[in-house]
Amino acid sequence: MKIFGTMYDKTMEWSKHRFAVFWLSFVSFIEAIFFPIPPDVMLIPMSMSKPKSAVKFAFYTAIASVIGGIIGYAIGFYATDWVENIVQQWGYAAHWAKAVSWFEQWGVLVVFVAGFSPIPYKVFTLCAGVMQMAFFPFVITAFVSRLARFLLVAKLAAWGGEKFAAKLRKSIEIIGWSVVVLAVIAYFILKN
């Protein structure tokens, strides 16, 4: 079954669309609050297809992510009980507990690390609000970390460019199914 090649082709097609920057910003914004798919899914192909615009794409992604993070912070700040209930329902309880302990231990530095962490960023934005972290240090640290991460991702993708995109396309089925198998294995390991 060849589904990853089709998805890859569609993503590359969307990355060249005239509204691609809008959708990249939108995905980045909602990912910082609740959306499960990271903006890298759009940032990488956009940076590969238009390497000279990679830095611009990274800035848009970071700004939208921070604005979304501010909304996540506000939700956490003003709706603590509701957030903790949703965290339980969505299966993020373990991530949440880890984020809370990190906030208690390291404060604002956690937001910086969160920009690069495999733990979903939305957990940290909501948690920062629940923990009532100082707002301006949160925003500044979030911007610096998100920009650093997205610049790194965009520049690496741009460096590979269209040549890398073509090579990646040839191996996308193997990569895609490998990720699925690893995710299933990780699920069963972490479940027990």
Curated annotation (Swiss-Prot):
It comes from the Bacteria. InterPro entries: DedA_domain (IPR051311), VTT_dom (IPR032816). GO terms for cellular component: plasma membrane. This is Uncharacterized protein HI_0703.
